[in-house]
Amino acid sequence: MGVTAFLFMRDIKTMKIAVVGSGISGLSAAWQLARSGHEVSLYEAGDYFGGHTNTVDITVDGKTFGVDTGFLVFNHRTYPNLVRLFDDIKVNTSASDMSFSCKLPLSDQPGARMLEWAGANLNTVFAQRRNLFNPRFLRMIRDILRFNRETTQMAQSDRAMDDMPLGDFLARRQYSTEFRDWYLLPMAGCIWSCPTEQMLAFPLATFVRFCQNHGLIQVSNRPQWYTVTGGARHYVVQLLKEITNKYLKTPVKSISRVDLGAQRQVKVESAMGSLMYDQVVLACHSDQSLALLSDASAEEKKILSAVGYQPNHAVLHTDASCLPARKQAWSAWNYESAGTQEPRVCVHYLLNMLQPLPCKTPVIVSLNPLSEPDPASVMGRFDYAHPVFDSAAIAAQQALPGIQGQRNTWFAGAWTGYGFHEDGLKSGLAVAEGFSIRAPWRSAGMAVGAS
């Protein structure tokens, strides 16, 4: 029984619904369902609610304040539902900075000279003045302009884009290795938090659409970015107010669908024992969802196993030695590489530029740092995982509607879109719409799928 059949056949009485996972997808689904009168139970295996929304308190320069270590920024153009949600629950936001820098060796040879540049303006692009006369660096800039021009034309064309891997497109169009290794792959690796080599398998059409929507291939008319004032946990607190039954440090052990004659229920097993629900929403990574289903169907196995994940380790610290040597190149996002053979993406988020912090000391979140920060500067360590988007993942996204609502089971997560906060929110709201529950702002004519 698919989504449409479920909508017409289900009993409209109040239901007991389990939501597994408290990231933006689970929170938004649980918030909507609870506000509509359903008896919702929110399960979270970790020691805080929020998933990738993880605000922690630190003390720097004698002041204690919250900083975000996961979800950090959004914009009004490509996060329309998140903007409306923040308006609805009265969350304050502040303007942010999305500048980008690169620091990497010019070759894989030991002792190779380092290249440093940043994209804020001409002064930072040529932070190393010798690059004004470096043919390889100028070739990169020329190819950036060509790529922006060609992909903009592709995005605006009525013709369907070829969905070849990004790496094949770069080779076919003879883009330089400097453009690929010094700009495009570092930028893309930072955005999706995955190794640059994995980005070469990214479907071209998906990549171009994303870059076009986010203003990444435009010189002008780029969106202004924002951050939640005081930390993104403020929106988590607001959403949790609507959810009565919420269980922290309560990992779900297994989920099974149980036929009770003419009625089907869902059995959720956790440290609280075995509890029966009318419906379950699995708002976690697809591989985690599959591991929980003790009786997964062949189609569920096919879809949920198709998406890979990249583990990433984040370190919160104040050791500025990881940033570019030239302070003028310091940016909000600072990519660092040890060479083309480096298997991980390393990016240093300078939180002072991303969030309005009350301190002058640099506060940094380093994702997969190449060298350990000074131990005395470390204030926290966190592990995250980000979906890897290849052709198999895109196919799984397209097939997902076919299993939504079947066997009283729903799936949500940022993995259903581009992997960002808006995608997670949209998936949670879409599940609620499966129960005929619309987001409050839908009355203004905005579809959940708007982007």
Model-inferred region functions:
Residues K16-L42:
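N-terminal Rossmann-like FAD-binding beta1-loop-alpha1 element of flavoenzymes
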Residues S25, Y48, D287:
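Conserved Rossmann-like nucleotide-cofactor binding loop
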Residues A34-D57:
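Glycine-rich FAD pyrophosphate-binding loop
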Residues S36, P251-H386:
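Mid-domain catalytic core of redox enzymes
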Residues V56-L82:
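N-terminal glycine-rich dinucleotide-binding loop that anchors FAD/FMN and/or NAD(P) in oxidoreductases
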Residues D57, A118-A120, E342-S451:
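Conserved flavin/dinucleotide-binding core of flavoenzymes
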Residues H76-L204:
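Mobile amphipathic helical/loop "lid" adjacent to a hydrophobic cofactor/ligand pocket
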Residues R209-V266, S270:
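Helical element adjacent to the flavin cofactor pocket in flavoenzyme catalytic cores
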